[in-house]
């Protein structure tokens, strides 16, 4: 029987230069795999907890304690186990932690091991990770949401909304969709430069200039799509991530960049106006995570017209998603493995969403690495969409390049952008 022979974690840096956990699992047959845990900037209050060291080292953001938990407590429990029983391995770590939010061992410790075990098991069986986790039915290449203009917590500018994204929905295969997206991205840069805008990049590779309001970035994206030779609304559509919890204060939505303070109803009306004017097909976190009444208003007004994605709202947590299903709010969920903390729990949440006709969007975090686990995971779970930043910066393109590799390897791969909306 093949078993887990060694588990080791060390501290490495993410794309923002902050420490994170890298877990490495070695099996008795010599198979070995590592996984690097991502970290978010705008985080939901109900997310599983990253364990940070505090103190002066790395300005308090060190993860040596989380690594120590892997190398002692977790390793002692899992060494000798079969790597192929992912659910049992994850459950043992959950029991060992014993807290609702994984604050004892740290979600960053637990997830690193969970991912590394899955990858080591796949290597042992000489299977690609997506095939190991998804089986024979893992065939769908996700339609990317490419964050090409950054605002909010992802950029140092006056734009309130956090992400302005393009979705190449009008193409027949992933490679062509990605090519078109890259062309729009580079065309956008030329337009910004021509108008004297700064083209510094935000955390996720998008441009982060100042604009006069929250609508102007959309105008630039439309121009870039057209100048690149594509049709807005047909070949390439637009998605927004408002990350509105970041500007929700005392029951109101404060759009500082526009000097406006809006109620939930007024904010929803603003979104309806934008959707009527531009080819917007998806809005993420349109209202704040604690504003369930606002979410109901948003869903009732726009839920039959566009995709409404819950990120901070659901935090990849099946219990919170179940509440949303029962209340009839949102119609899609963002899937971030580090919000919940294990591979198995992430898969459970995806299955619950899909059973209830909620779309699933696999997602990176703003603090990423060269680890492309989520590319395989998106295909394994037949998530129809993926968010992993602009087609720039190595940690973002690692995911796109892996998806290109997967697309070439699957006979009969499906790209369903045209059928999403």
Curated annotation (Swiss-Prot):
Chain residues that bind (2R)-2-phosphoglycerate: 162, 336, 365-366, 387
PANTHER family: ENOLASE (PTHR11902:SF1)
Superkingdom of source: Bacteria
Cofactor binding remark: Binds a second Mg(2+) ion via substrate during catalysis.
CDD domains in alphabetical order: enolase (cd03313)
Pathway: Carbohydrate degradation; glycolysis; pyruvate from D-glyceraldehyde 3-phosphate: step 4/5
Protein name: Enolase
Gene giving rise to this polypeptide: eno
Lineage: Bacteria, Pseudomonadati, Campylobacterota, Epsilonproteobacteria, Nautiliales
Species of the source: Nautilia profundicola (strain ATCC BAA-1463 / DSM 18972 / AmH)
NCBIfam families tied to this protein: eno
Gene3D superfamilies: Enolase-like C-terminal domain, Enolase-like, N-terminal domain
């Amino acid at each position: 029987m093949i078993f887990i022979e060694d588990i080791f974690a060390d501290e490495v840096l993410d794309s923002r230069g902050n420490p994170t956990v890298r877990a490495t699992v070695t099996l008795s047959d010599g198979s070995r795999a590592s996984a690097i845990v991502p970290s978010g900037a705008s985080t939901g209050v109900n997310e599983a907890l990253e364990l940070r060291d505090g103190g002066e080292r790395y300005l308090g953001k060190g993860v040596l304690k989380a690594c120590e938990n892997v190398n002692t407590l977790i390793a002692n429990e899992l060494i000798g186990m079969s790597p192929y029983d992912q659910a049992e391995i994850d459950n043992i770590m959950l029991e060992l932690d014993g807290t609702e939010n994984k604050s004892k061992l740290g979600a960053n410790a637990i997830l690193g091991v969970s991912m590394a075990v899955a990858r080591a098991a796949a290597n042992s069986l000489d299977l690609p990770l997506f095939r190991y986790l998804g089986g024979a039915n893992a065939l769908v290449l996700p339609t990317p949401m490419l964050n090409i203009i950054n605002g909010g917590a992802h950029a140092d500018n006056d734009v309130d909304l956090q992400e302005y994204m393009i979705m190449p929905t009008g193409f027949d295969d992933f490679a062509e969709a990605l090519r078109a997206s890259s062309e729009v991205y580079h065309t956008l840069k030329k337009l910004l430069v021509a108008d004297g805008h700064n083209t510094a990049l935000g955390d996720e590779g998008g441009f982060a200039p100042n604009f006069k309001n929250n609508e102007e970035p959309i105008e630039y994206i439309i121009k870039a799509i057209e100048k690149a030779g594509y049709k807005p609304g047909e070949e390439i559509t637009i998605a927004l991530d408002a990350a509105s919890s970041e500007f929700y204060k005392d029951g109101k939505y404060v759009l500082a960049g526009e000097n406006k303070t809006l109620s939930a109803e007024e904010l929803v009306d603003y979104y309806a106006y934008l959707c009527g004017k531009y080819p917007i097909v998806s809005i993420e976190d349109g209202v704040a995570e604690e504003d369930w009444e606002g979410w109901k208003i948003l869903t009732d007004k726009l839920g039959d017209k566009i995709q409404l994605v819950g990120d901070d709202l659901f935090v990849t947590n099946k219990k919170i998603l179940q509440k949303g299903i029962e209340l009839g709010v949102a119609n899609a969920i963002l899937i971030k493995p580090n919000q919940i903390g294990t591979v198995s729990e992430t898969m459970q949440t995806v299955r619950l969403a899909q059973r209830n006709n909620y779309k699933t969007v696999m997602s990176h975090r703003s603090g990423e690495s060269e680890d492309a686990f989520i590319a395989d995971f998106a295909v394994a779970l037949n998530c129809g969409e993926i968010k992993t930043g602009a087609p720039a910066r190595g940690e973002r393109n690692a995911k796109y390049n892996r998806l290109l590799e997967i697309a070439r390897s699957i006979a009969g791969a499906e790209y369903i952008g045209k059928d999403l909306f």
